[in-house]
Amino acid sequence: MAQRIVSISAAPYDGYAFPQVLDSLAACGVSHVEPAFIVGYTEPFDESAFTPGEAQQYAKWLSASGLGCYAFSSHIDLGRHDAVSVFCGRMDFAARLGAKVINTNAAARRNEAGFFNNIKVLARHAEQLGMIIGLENPGDGSDNLFNTAQDGIALLDAIGNTNVRLNYDAGNTISHRPQSRDGGVNPAADALLAMPHCAYTHIKDVRAAADGYFFTPLGHGDIDCAAILRALAATDLNCSIEMPLRLHRAPNAQPQRKPEPVPRAVLEAAISESLAFACRHLEIASLTQGVA
């Protein structure tokens, strides 16, 4: 088995310039970064962020840092009328950074027809780029085409294209479909159900409380991240650790951003602890399973 890539999402560094992100991640011993462009979850941006010139600059920064880019997050509703032009531009940008997976939400259920029209075109473009589109389950409680693993599996069956797979995030499930409510699921169990259908997966821990959902370093929340990592060890999937620590979700699952970025020292401590947690559980599981 090839060496597994464990990336760190750039989402925790909301408010930092990309060279600062890379410098900090390198100081933590990280090998790969997953850039994140997500409306409402990161600093505001528009499509001018994804020009060939911007991609060239990002690629230079990556090269200078020594970090790689295997996955890229840039979520939109793929059922939008402009989704093909917007997402193709973002796919081109990600490909220029070396990304093999681009993660996005699927679509609101009301945009189902547009989604199925658009995904045909987007899947062909992904194939031309040698890239896989990773459909990610959302966390905001809305009605999406991909609310739970079963939805995602059925969606892939309907799409029928190997360039479209899942990117399951159990840290989204806990707020999107809480186990205590009708239609809710256990986040870790649902992640394991989705895993055979994934091109990638996010490892994210969340503490649920009366006043909302709070992102934590791995092992400090209510997601059984250890179980997900143990299952991951038996596959050839790569993954990202994602800790959007500038955010929390309100009780209604809507994201709330703090006014100021998280201090670098806090981020580096959380990243170092979480990376060690992930590597420890992957290694233990691999030894137990006899995986090289």
Give residue spans per PLM region.
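Glycine-/small-residue-rich active-site loops that bind phosphorylated ligands and cofactors
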Residues: 13-14, 79, 109-111, 140-144
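Histidine-acidic metal/acid-base catalytic patches
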Residues: 1-10, 14-32, 59, 63, ...
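Aromatic-lined carbohydrate-recognition surfaces of secreted/lumenal glycan-active proteins
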Residues: 134-142, 168
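Active-site-proximal beta-strand/loop segments in catalytic clefts of secreted hydrolases
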Residues: 11, 105, 136-138
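Structural motif corresponding to the early beta-alpha repeats
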Residues: 31-120, 124, 128-132, 172, ...
